Design a protein with these regions (language model features):
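All-alpha amphipathic helical-bundle segments outside canonical DNA-binding/catalytic cores
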Residues: 2-3, 119-131
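ATP/Mg2+ or Mg2+-diphosphate-binding catalytic cores
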Residues: 140-217
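Active-site activation/catalytic loop segments of kinase-like enzymes and analogous catalytic loops
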Residues: 13-22, 81-117, 129-149, 161-170
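Conserved small/polar residues in nucleotide/adenosyl-binding loops
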Residues: 227-231
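Extended, well-ordered alpha-helical scaffold segments
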Residues: 28-39, 104, 154-164
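Active-site acidic catalytic loop and adjacent metal/ATP-binding pocket
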Residues: 39-85, 92-96
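N-terminal low-complexity segments that are often proline-rich with Ser/Thr-Pro
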Residues: 214-226
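ATP-dependent phospho-/nucleotidyl transfer catalytic cores
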Residues: 1-53, 64
Length: 231
């Protein structure tokens, strides 16, 4: 497998169909697709014959005897060196402080120079596009696993990814004007503007009859059924 235009557009459309459309937002698909194509061109400006882990995040790094071991790399492929940095340092729920993120990024560039020449200014300019791309891919995954498969962990992760996106959009991406306007509207939707810390326990009480089937449990954790006998 290889990081190429097909895989890029697949991920961007994953975001469009599994997350963006699920919000009910209206947008012009042809203009959005134009910016998707522009993004694929930007991401493919520099390629390297390196291993791209793809799902590189802290939960996939296990420590055994003081040494890191890596799991869940079946999505790995040949690709550019920027993607995994974006995946790890901008993972939605980690909320790394800016100082720590910059320190880790500096360490990465220093280590990378042992293998290939690195123009640090160009590296940073290219990395920001991969961070945006990875954030959209993650939202697509959260949309599919959360909104469609009803898995609560992914639904709970959405506000963190939206906040990442909100922070990214503070710096302009002139290459993708329409995409950015759509994303700014997305981050301003009411369901994404609530304080992450204010989410409270929700209890739903309803009646059902077995002849109509087993009631749906949207929480994904089994719920609780209370039986009462008629008086």
């Amino acid at each position: 497998a290889e990081f190429n235009q097909r895989s890029i557009l697949w991920d961007l459309n994953y975001f469009k169909y599994c997350f963006l459309k699920a919000t009910g937002m209206e947008f012009q698909e042809n203009r959005l697709e134009d910016d998707f194509l522009k993004m694929s061109d930007v991401l493919l400006r520099s390629s390297s014959a390196t291993f791209l882990y793809r799902d590189f995040q802290s939960r996939n790094v296990m420590v055994k005897d003081g040494e890191p071991w890596f799991i869940d790399f079946q999505g790995g492929r040949k690709g550019p060196v920027y993607y995994d940095v974006a995946s790890f340092l901008w993972q939605a729920k980690a909320k790394y402080p800016e100082d720590l993120r910059n320190e880790l990024l500096s360490d990465y560039i220093t280590a990378l120079r042992k293998y290939i020449p690195v123009d640090e200014a160009y590296f940073h300019s290219q990395l920001r596009h991969f961070v945006l791309f990875r954030t959209l891919q993650v939202l697509g995954a959260y949309g599919f696993r959360g909104y469609f498969e009803k898995k609560p962990h992914f639904i709970q992760s959405v506000p963190f990814a939206i906040e990442n996106l909100r922070q990214l959009l503070k710096n302009d991406y002139p290459e993708y004007p329409y995409l950015c306007s759509v994303l700014r509207e997305l981050t301003g939707l009411k369901q994404f503007t609530d304080d992450i810390q204010k989410h409270m326990l929700e209890v739903k009480v309803m009646s059902f009859a077995y002849k109509k089937g087993i009631p749906n449990d949207p929480s994904g954790n089994g719920g609780c059924l209370l039986y009462t006998s008629p008086s």
